[in-house]
């Protein structure tokens, strides 16, 4: 796997801290503004999400009981794998969905290694002969398989065998938007985790760039308005492309900057709030990569870009949904802050007894990609998946017995005191910038 520029100088504001894990006796609490900003930094697609179902949903209404015997779990997983080759499209979709939920919420490397050829053949048929939702689910399962198998020879072999199909569906303008969207995401995630060599990376980058350039008109001199049905495809291709930029060799980065940095601002005027946000975050990432290559990097059209970013950061149009306005303003304030001043806001992610710091745009793109793929299972994978712990610099998996866990756990009363103190400090900080009626009078 062409892992992300590890031999280079650490990224400013990004990997110098590595994301390291540390014990935390504090409760996972924070201000509502921080939560809103964190929510705003996570862009979702406009097609129906495959992560909308809870992790308890399963084939035939059964549940994957995390506390149940391992034998029962494997029996259910075998049923799901067998269901992938059923004659009924509805049964195949149910099996794919159940398998996807299991892969997102559990670590199953041994089970998957034994059946990787069976799974590869079944997913190939689903991508070739399936339609719409079935292709979308198959692509999502493939991405999760790469996360489970990791960057070794087995994962590389799986991705390399199905990469041409992902490229084919993604480039097919007659395929359903949902299928193309999830093929784009799977292509980005699979290539990030299991690309065999740099040539695979370059070919995936070229395909993804071609999709969002053709769909949204960023590669043409004339303005081109993409239909609403393609906004999700465009957004997913752009985000997958940005993910792969974080592991792209410096020699290729400079050419990409020259080609795409002047074009991407066109997407800031899109009708889709998700596409605008994805474009803004990608622009910030390109600035970060450019400043890594050249410390005194100067963008020629800086004034016009900052003006557009400032407008989006203060947008108050009433015809937009309130949640969309809040998400857009929060994101573009952070983008503008980085483009103008070079400082990236830090996001703190607590899981179990550990803490992950997301303090660069490259790190944010990687974290968001895994978050969208794994959904509610992200924290489980951060704690136990060696691949994710290596990517985010979390070190070996923590092994804690029941006594250690009990010693680290704080009581409900202590948690209440901590939250009360945080609330009081937050109120004082906010009161300084609020209008006072007495001052106005």
UniProtKB/Swiss-Prot annotation:
Residues 1-15 have a biased composition (Basic residues). One of its GO terms (biological process) is negative regulation of translation. Keywords: Translation regulation. It holds the Pfam family IFRD_C. GO terms for molecular function: ribosome binding; translation repressor activity. The keyword tRNA-binding does not apply. Transmembrane segments: none annotated. Gene3D superfamilies: Leucine-rich Repeat Variant (1.25.10.10). InterPro entries: ARM-like, ARM-type_fold, IFRD, Interferon-rel_develop_reg_C, Interferon-rel_develop_reg_N. It comes from the Eukaryota. Residues 1-72 are annotated as: Disordered. SUPFAM superfamilies: ARM repeat. Belongs to the IFRD family. Associates with ribosomes; promoting ribosome inactivation. Ribosome-binding protein that acts as an inhibitor of mRNA translation by promoting ribosome inactivation. Associates with the P- and E-sites of the ribosome and inserts a C-terminal helix into the mRNA exit channel to preclude translation. PANTHER family: INTERFERON-RELATED DEVELOPMENTAL REGULATOR, INTERFERON-RELATED DEVELOPMENTAL REGULATOR 2. This is Interferon-related developmental regulator 2. It comes from Oryctolagus cuniculus (Rabbit).
């Amino acid at each position: 796997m062409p892992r992300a520029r590890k031999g280079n100088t650490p990224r400013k504001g990004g990997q110098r801290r590595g994301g390291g894990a540390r014990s935390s006796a504090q409760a996972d609490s924070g201000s509502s503004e921080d939560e809103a900003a964190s929510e705003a930094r996570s862009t979702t697609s406009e097609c129906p999400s495959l992560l909308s179902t809870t992790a308890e949903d399963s084939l035939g209404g059964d549940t994957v009981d995390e506390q149940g015997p391992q034998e029962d779990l494997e029996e259910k997983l075998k049923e799901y794998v067998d269901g992938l080759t059923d004659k009924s499209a509805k049964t195949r979709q149910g099996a794919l969905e159940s398998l996807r939920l299991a892969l997102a919420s559990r670590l199953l490397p041994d089970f998957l290694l034994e059946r990787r050829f069976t799974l590869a053949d079944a997913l190939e048929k689903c991508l070739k002969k399936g339609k719409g939702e079935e292709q979308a689910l198959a692509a999502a399962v493939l991405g999760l398989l790469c996360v489970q198998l990791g960057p070794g020879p087995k994962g590389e072999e799986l991705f390399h065998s199905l990469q041409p199909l992902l490229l084919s569906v993604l480039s097919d303008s007659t395929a359903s938007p949902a299928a193309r969207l999830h093929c784009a995401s799977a292509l980005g995630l699979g290539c990030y985790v299991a690309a065999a060599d740099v040539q695979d990376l370059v070919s995936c980058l070229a395909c993804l760039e071609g999709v969002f350039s053709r769909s949204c008109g960023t590669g043409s001199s004339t303005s081109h308005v993409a239909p609403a049905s393609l906004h999700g495809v465009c957004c997913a291709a752009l985000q997958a492309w940005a993910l792969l930029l974080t592991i792209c060799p410096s020699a290729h980065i400079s050419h990409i900057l020259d080609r795409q940095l002047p074009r991407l601002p066109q997407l800031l005027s899109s009708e889709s709030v998700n596409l605008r946000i994805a474009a803004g975050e990608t622009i910030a990432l390109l600035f970060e990569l450019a400043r890594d290559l050249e410390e005194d990097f100067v963008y020629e059209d800086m004034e016009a870009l900052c003006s557009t970013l400032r407008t989006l950061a203060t947008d108050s149009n009433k015809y937009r949904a309130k949640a969309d306005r809040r998400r857009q303003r929060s994101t573009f304030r952070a983008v503008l802050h980085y483009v103008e001043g070079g400082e990236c806001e830090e996001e703190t992610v607590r899981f179990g007894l550990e803490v992950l710091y997301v303090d660069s745009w490259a790190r944010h793109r990687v974290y968001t990609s895994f978050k969208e793929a794994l959904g509610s299972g992200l924290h489980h994978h951060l704690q136990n998946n060696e691949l994710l712990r290596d990517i985010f610099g979390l070190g070996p998996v923590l092994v804690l017995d029941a006594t250690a866990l009990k010693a680290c756990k704080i009581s409900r009363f202590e948690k209440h005191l901590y939250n009360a103190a945080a609330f009081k400090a937050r109120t004082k900080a906010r009161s300084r910038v609020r209008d006072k009626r007495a001052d106005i009078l």
